[in-house]
Amino acid sequence: MTPMKIILAAPRGFCAGVNMAIDSLDLTLQKFGPPVYVYHEIVHNQFVVKTFREKGAVFVDTIDEVPEGGVLLFSAHGVSPEIRKAAQARKLHALDATCPLVTKVHLEAIKYAKAGYTIILIGHEGHDEVLGTMGEAPEAIVLVEDEADVDRLEFEPGTQLAYLTQTTLSVDDAGRVIRRLRERFPEIHSPPKDDICYATQNRQEAVKLLREDADVIVVLGSQNSSNSQRLKELAAEQGKRAMLVDGPQDLAVDQFSDDDRVLITAGASAPESVVQSTIDWLKENFDASVDTQVVREEDVQFPLPKPLRAFAAEQAAAK
């Protein structure tokens, strides 16, 4: 019998936006001390959120939960102008860890709205990123999730249309919705550059290319992570066994066979530590070997929020 083989996908795990957001929260806690309030989860990963709670971060869903004058960090998913104004009204010391690729979508929404366009936003209702983007121009944005939503759209003749997308969508799903939009509204404007982020695309590409050789696919990530859910869906497309788990604590020995070929990847908000602990669990239980498959190299970094850059430099110099 051939022993278990782990196919370790690369790239996987943290993207540049998540790295920046996590570094920002770490530095904010060091600079100001706890408690540091974070509007929504810093990233959609339960392990990361638990770790920061233990360090003194407090995750809130409304600005009213933050004491006046408190320190507040906006998460990687971005916020609406209304939230920024509410933070100012409470005299909060607000820092912004919004991913620059999300900010790009916000700026596109503002630009199109000012030019008189109706914006069709492709995304998941209720997702933090979607709420922030829609808040930039609520009177001008219509949300769609799939082709059926597109088929229900009706606009006055002569309406100028543009579309934008949530950054963490399935490339294939978004492509189908965009094709339907173009069929129904041939004059619709598209963003100058694809809104789906590089890391989302790269991780999906790796799963597509590597799933053929796998019997089972394990995606490390949390259930509320949009990009992790899309990876699981992609993994399961051809009838393969696919699971989305936070770590080895969610796995059972009877889910695997001794000779399985197990593809492991991780969503953009899942830390490498949970990948390694999952590999260790499979090695311990199945004597598995690891074969890393690099599909694409990544070397992207995003700058910290300006108020943290000098402090970060001081901390680095002191080491």
Curated annotation (Swiss-Prot):
Pathway of action: Isoprenoid biosynthesis; dimethylallyl diphosphate biosynthesis; dimethylallyl diphosphate from (2E)-4-hydroxy-3-methylbutenyl diphosphate: step 1/1; Isoprenoid biosynthesis; isopentenyl diphosphate biosynthesis via DXP pathway; isopentenyl diphosphate from 1-deoxy-D-xylulose 5-phosphate: step 6/6
Binding-site residues, dimethylallyl diphosphate: 44, 77, 127, 225-227, 269
Cofactor section: [4Fe-4S] cluster
UniProt keyword list: 4Fe-4S, Iron, Iron-sulfur, Isoprene biosynthesis, Metal-binding, Oxidoreductase
Binding site for isopentenyl diphosphate: 44, 77, 127, 225-227, 269
Annotated [4Fe-4S] cluster binding sites: 15, 99, 197
GO biological process terms on file: dimethylallyl diphosphate biosynthetic process; isopentenyl diphosphate biosynthetic process, methylerythritol 4-phosphate pathway; terpenoid biosynthetic process
Binding positions for (2E)-4-hydroxy-3-methylbut-2-enyl diphosphate per the UniProt entry: 44, 77, 127, 167, 225-227, 269
Cofactor note (record): Binds 1 [4Fe-4S] cluster per subunit.
InterPro entries from the UniProt entry: LytB/IspH (IPR003451)
Class of the enzyme per the UniProt entry, highest EC level: oxidoreductase
Superkingdom of this protein's organism: Bacteria
Catalysis performed (reactions): isopentenyl diphosphate + 2 oxidized [2Fe-2S]-[ferredoxin] + H2O = (2E)-4-hydroxy-3-methylbut-2-enyl diphosphate + 2 reduced [2Fe-2S]-[ferredoxin] + 2 H(+); dimethylallyl diphosphate + 2 oxidized [2Fe-2S]-[ferredoxin] + H2O = (2E)-4-hydroxy-3-methylbut-2-enyl diphosphate + 2 reduced [2Fe-2S]-[ferredoxin] + 2 H(+)
Annotated GO CC locations: cytosol
Family matches, as Pfam families: LYTB (PF02401)
Catalytic-site annotation from UniProt: 129
GO molecular function term, any single one: 4-hydroxy-3-methylbut-2-enyl diphosphate reductase activity
EC number(s) recorded for this UniProt protein: 1.17.7.4
Similarity field: Belongs to the IspH family.
Functional note: Catalyzes the conversion of 1-hydroxy-2-methyl-2-(E)-butenyl 4-diphosphate (HMBPP) into a mixture of isopentenyl diphosphate (IPP) and dimethylallyl diphosphate (DMAPP). Acts in the terminal step of the DOXP/MEP pathway for isoprenoid precursor biosynthesis.
Protein name: 4-hydroxy-3-methylbut-2-enyl diphosphate reductase
The organism of origin for this protein: Rhodopirellula baltica (strain DSM 10527 / NCIMB 13988 / SH1)
Origin organism lineage: Bacteria, Pseudomonadati, Planctomycetota, Planctomycetia, Pirellulales
Annotated gene: ispH
